[in-house]
Amino acid sequence: MKAEIHPNYHSITVVMTDGTEYVTRSTWGNEGDKLNLDIDSKSHPAWTGGQQQMLDRGGRVSRFQKKFSGFLKKD
């Protein structure tokens, strides 16, 4: 096996959408970095039963809704 081909595995702090933090080990970033989550299990509709709204990243959802707004409407 080749030496030094594995990524650096270190501790980081993950910040949830509600501000809670926990420390885990990851290959992301550098030792001690903070990873701020945009969506997590406390804010994603799949885990909240649809009570939270998804963020519209880059207007994708609004463009889709505009494009197909009258698609299934019955007169």
Swiss-Prot record:
<dbReference type="GO" id="GO:1990904">
    <property type="term" value="C:ribonucleoprotein complex"/>
</dbReference>
<comment type="function">
    <text>Binds the 23S rRNA.</text>
</comment>
<dbReference type="GO" id="GO:0003735">
    <property type="term" value="F:structural constituent of ribosome"/>
</dbReference>
<comment type="similarity">
    <text>Belongs to the bacterial ribosomal protein bL31 family. Type A subfamily.</text>
</comment>
<dbReference type="InterPro" id="IPR034704">
    <property type="entry name" value="Ribosomal_bL28/bL31-like_sf"/>
</dbReference>
<keyword id="KW-0689">Ribosomal protein</keyword>
<dbReference type="GO" id="GO:0019843">
    <property type="term" value="F:rRNA binding"/>
</dbReference>
<dbReference type="GO" id="GO:0006412">
    <property type="term" value="P:translation"/>
</dbReference>
<dbReference type="GO" id="GO:0005840">
    <property type="term" value="C:ribosome"/>
</dbReference>
<keyword id="KW-0699">rRNA-binding</keyword>
<keyword id="KW-0694">RNA-binding</keyword>
<protein>
    <recommendedName>
        <fullName>Large ribosomal subunit protein bL31</fullName>
    </recommendedName>
</protein>
<dbReference type="InterPro" id="IPR027491">
    <property type="entry name" value="Ribosomal_bL31_A"/>
</dbReference>
<keyword id="KW-0687">Ribonucleoprotein</keyword>
<dbReference type="Pfam" id="PF01197">
    <property type="entry name" value="Ribosomal_L31"/>
</dbReference>
<dbReference type="InterPro" id="IPR002150">
    <property type="entry name" value="Ribosomal_bL31"/>
</dbReference>
<dbReference type="InterPro" id="IPR042105">
    <property type="entry name" value="Ribosomal_bL31_sf"/>
</dbReference>
<comment type="subunit">
    <text>Part of the 50S ribosomal subunit.</text>
</comment>
